[in-house]
Amino acid sequence: MINQISIKNQMLSLVLLFTWIANAQEPVDYVNPLVGTDSKPSMSNGNTYPAIAMPWGMNFWTPQTGKMGDGWAYTYAADKLRGFKQTHQPSPWMNDYGQFAIMPLTGKLRFTEDDRASWFSHKSEIVKPYYYSVYLADHDITTEITPTERAAMFRFTFPENEHSQIVLDALDKGSYVKIIPDERKIIGYTTKNSGGVPDNFKNYFVMVFDKDFETTKTFSGEQLLEGLEIETDHAGGIVGFKTKRGEVVIAKVASSFISYDQAELNLRELGNDDFNTIKEKGRASWNKELGRIKVEGGNVDQFRTFYSCLYRSLLFPRKFFEYDVNGKVVHYSPYNGKVLPGYMFTDTGFWDTFRALFPFLNLMYPELNSQIQEGLANAYKEGGWLPEWGSPGLRNVMVGNNSASVVADAYLKNGETNTYDIATLYEALIHGANNAGPLTAVGRAGVDYYNKIGYVPYDVGINENAARTLEYAYDDFTIYQLAKALNKPKKEINLYKKRSLNYKNLFDPETKLMRGKNENGEFMAPFNPFKWGDAFTEGNSWHYTWSVFHDIQGLADLMGGNEAFANKLDEVFSLPPIFDESYYGGVIHEIREMQVANMGQYAHGNQPIQHMPYLYNFAGQAWKTQYWVRETMDRMYTAEPDGYCGDEDNGQTSAWYVFSALGFYPVCPGTDQYVLGTPLFQKTTLILEDGKEISINAPKNSTSNKYVNALTINGKVHSKNWLSHKELIQGAILNFDMTGTPNKTRGTNSEDFPFSLSNEK
């Protein structure tokens, strides 16, 4: 008995020790940058690459398994690396711009991307947000990278070899390389891009070594050349030296979209620090931002998934500005090609990110979001339009006019502290809402129809017309909200309120679903609610019917009341995952991801329906929200390379998880409200920018105890199915009483439901 007690005590001590060790880890230690990299064009488990970067950094770095120009720059299943790429890629579908690659090698000179490629193993790979290391087996070289916002330091550990080399590949589409041996330096530029750039676009780079060059070469495409300078379609440079076994060579790299001189200035970010110091500074930067949210009382897998999602939420939009010789903020404009003062951000698609990412930044990083808003004002002044998908300039992708949501939500939640030009931004919103742009994804395609008859018709040659109508109506609501806050004329306010009800024009009373409508007022026929595309964007009617973020009560009324509405929500999950792909001529990856998820018509891998599980709160059935949100978190997310259920999309799908883990979600950006879900952890602490804290306590939380029995805020019973942003940012203590049995009486009264325009007084 004594021995048994002793053994039990020892085991308990070990458990406590391991728990302490786990809890002692810092937030960045839980991050896995490889989440989402096990992807391909036909099946996205994230479509990410390991971004070795600072939060919102101007430049990212990634190991490169894909070929030059391949949007799938790094795929987990690959077994060879072709180089280490400076990248600005937001998505494989958008591809990259301003990229160039670096690759060390030994022995016979092999500079083309296939010849220089080396086998590698994930077993000899270390991947952190602030640090990357890998062993290149074919060259017997260990390569390490640690970044700053605009620069990076490489550490190469070579074997003994007479012919150790480093290749700098400036890639094709117009590039230049110059080797300067006396300065141990390579400079150059790349113009490679995927669109959305002015004619004078260049990314200027400088690379400085700590070792003299013994050999130098340049190349043009596959042709090796003598000489130190080359300007051609596809330029590159090679420097070589003898190395001893274990010899370390350091290279410092920086770049600029402005000039060579600015690239040299950007090297200042590295200063005189050694590699390990830069690495530790990077680690500290990530811990500072990730540490703004502290989670306790979950398992290690949940910690890893949470912080990996939080990491992805802190990468985009990227900083597209630099600091001049006087420390002033300047930027190269991707809209007019000029160098101008002020902030600029890019690489985000508002169709994705207005939903959760930007509301998350408004809550946790409002100062950064104020800079982003200034950047949007600059974008409008420089290009005449707000970017709906910027990478780096205007790109013709997706639908909607969702810059309105991004601008309005930022001002409405943090307007009292804003220092940016809201007057210019409001002007930009009005301009975008009433004009078709130079691209169909800018301004509003079909705006004349929409403003005249209240919808974009199905039969006038404008694709995805129902999706456009629904998104325009919501965007008009956000303009209405902003117009009220800015005390605009009553006539103007009422105009956008009226337009925000245009969603009703597409509601089909027969099917109780949204449906494309012809110019003559008749619904399009035949109608297949399972048909993807056509009247909708990357989805079908079962997905887009819920895109009435601002007036869920109005939608419920159209369906016949709250019970009928809740039953329709139930159908999304109970229907089989059938589909009609005929619009696309084949099964696109978003369809396949819905099909394999086994959640009916719920397609969490794509954005239009991600808010839908929270809508039960508007019908007095909050427990169903709690069930389906937890199901989605548990089944659709992991911290592994296949950890997403579709494209991660620049922080949006990650921000959904982060918000949901907190226990609430911004169903309707442009209002003050977050709709309640179910917290994931037993304790979460949000440290706001001004030092105030939001404490979220759910001590009985567990896998089975996922239902909210009761909630108090600052000691007062809270029966409502929503939280106020204004109340939260004052500092708040939320105490959730969790249970394994649904509480079907809490939040059932209409006065407890979240905001709907139809209920506005």
Q: Where do the language-model regions lie?
A:
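Short aromatic-glycine motifs in intrinsically disordered, low-complexity regions
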Residues: I694-S702
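Accessory carbohydrate-recognition regions in carbohydrate-active enzymes
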Residues: Q25-F358, N362-S405, Y411-L470, Q481-N505, ...
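Hydrophobic, small-residue-rich alpha-helical packing segments that form membrane-like cores
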Residues: E471-D475
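Bacterial Sec-dependent N-terminal signal peptides
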Residues: M1-Q25
